[in-house]
């Protein structure tokens, strides 16, 4: 098995004249297939970093049960998944082929996503297959990039990190010149037709009633049912990302350009984070609309905290997060519980569950064992996912999966792919859902989906009017 050795070199420049968006606009045409990951929570030291990843060196993807690895020497390897050759083994094997030394090597890792559909590789869950002839998206894709631009918003610092192989010349001067360039191409965005959904409001309400019936029968305690929307468009979808990050700032902002398609969004929810030997899950369960009036919003948050249906849902999903972490962790505890957090269109109840990794626990396996999030599937998780496959008329694709970073040391930070667009073939696909329990009401659940979609639909409207 071949290995690839790199040294990470870095250069620090003053960052007070730059933003992640301004730099991304300058470099994206020169470095196609790039990724942008931001945090809007600049006030907290722990969430004060944003990243731009440029120039793919290598990647690992899984599609239709085949693992495809591409390497810096332009070689490719394909191997089918088997009972012994699992996604976990493939990922660990791929990571082990890269050795990186030098300063800031911790940001040199894999940036990418795992779709909800990938659950079929981890559990016996049927998934409706659908593939795009022109721009098919793998069920899972993680990319190693040559350059990482790191923004430290807390310190106003910009660090350019480059992975260099032996004998390679630095490309940092060209990258720095691109960043300092005052000019960049600008493109418009427009919608070319009305937004549509594969199912009507009444059909979604009927699906909700099916979910309630399964809860009443005791098949599940809770099930998350979602609905997809499609918006045809022309032009530059990055304007939709810019609008969304402005309307709905979140801890996880991301724009991944994978060539034939793009995945971008503004997620409030940590799927799984592993750092310094501890794993974290931040379940969000319990949602109400936001009015923008401070007094009314506080009253709505208090009503949410007192709502028996929302409380039952939240308790269930905190327990599920504890169970998921307990598979590979000890000292599992709840760090904060049912904290109201305010977003542009909604108020969420959020908890944080953490566990100490067992000695010898594999970090990738720990991540996979938490997938998908209970807040996007239900409880018990496997039965809920089986019912989702029966009830929802389409597969979920990226929605409900996760997106983020996996370090070469296995430490990772993954957001749940919600409040997210998938852009492909001049269509924006977006989706939202809600947790169904025995006490749910179909009309309320329909309204909850509309509340969650509010920021996405508003972002499309705003993007049309962005002039530069």
Specify the residue positions occupied by each region the protein language model found.
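Extended alpha-helical targeting/anchoring segments
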Residues: 1-468
């Amino acid at each position: 098995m071949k290995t690839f050795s790199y040294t990470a070199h870095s250069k620090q420049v003053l960052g007070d004249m730059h933003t992640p968006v301004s730099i991304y606009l300058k470099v994206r045409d020169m470095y196609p297939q790039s990724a942008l990951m931001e945090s809007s929570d600049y006030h907290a030291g722990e969430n004060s970093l944003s990243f731009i990843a440029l120039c793919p060196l290598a990647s690992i993807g899984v599609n239709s049960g085949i693992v495809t690895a591409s390497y810096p020497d332009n070689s490719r390897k394909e191997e089918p998944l088997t009972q012994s050759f699992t996604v976990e083994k493939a990922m660990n094997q791929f990571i082990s082929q890269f050795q990186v030394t030098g300063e800031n090597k911790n940001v040199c890792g894999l940036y990418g996503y795992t779709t909800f559909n990938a659950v079929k590789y981890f559990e016996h869950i049927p998934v409706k297959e659908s593939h795009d002839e022109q721009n098919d998206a793998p069920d899972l894709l993680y990319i190693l990039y040559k350059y990482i631009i790191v923004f430290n918003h807390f310190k106003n610092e910009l660090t350019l990190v480059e992975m260099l192989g032996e004998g390679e010349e630095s490309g940092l001067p060209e990258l720095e010149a691109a960043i300092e360039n005052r000019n960049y191409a600008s493109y418009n965005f427009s919608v070319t037709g009305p937004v549509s959904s594969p199912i009507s409001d009444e059909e979604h309400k009927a699906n909700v009633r099916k979910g309630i019936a399964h809860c009443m029968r005791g098949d599940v305690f809770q099930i998350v049912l979602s609905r997809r929307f499609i918006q045809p468009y022309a032009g530059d979808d990055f304007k939709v990302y810019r609008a969304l990050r402005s309307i709905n700032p979140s801890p996880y902002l991301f724009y991944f350009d994978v060539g034939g398609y793009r995945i971008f969004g503004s997620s409030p929810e940590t799927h799984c984070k592993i750092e310094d030997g501890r794993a974290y899950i931040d379940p969000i369960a319990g949602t109400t609309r936001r009015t923008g009036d401070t007094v009314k919003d506080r009253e709505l948050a208090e009503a949410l905290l007192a709502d028996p249906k929302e409380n039952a849902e939240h308790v269930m999903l905190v327990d599920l997060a504890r169970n998921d972490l307990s598979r590979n962790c000890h000292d599992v505890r709840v760090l904060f519980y049912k904290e109201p957090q305010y977003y542009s269109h909604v108020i969420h109840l959020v908890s944080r569950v953490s566990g100490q990794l067992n000695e010898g626990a594999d970090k990738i396996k720990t991540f996979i064992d938490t997938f998908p999030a209970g807040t996007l599937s239900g409880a018990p998780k496997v039965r809920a996912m089986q019912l989702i496959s029966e009830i929802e008329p389409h597969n979920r694709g990226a929605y409900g999966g996760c997106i983020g970073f996996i370090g070469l040391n296995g430490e990772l930070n993954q957001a749940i792919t919600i409040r997210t667009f998938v852009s492909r073939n001049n269509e924006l696909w977006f989706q939202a859902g809600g947790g169904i329990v025995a006490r749910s009401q179909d009309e309320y659940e329909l309204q909850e989906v509309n509340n969650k979609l509010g920021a996405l639909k508003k972002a499309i409207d705003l993007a049309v009017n962005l002039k530069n």
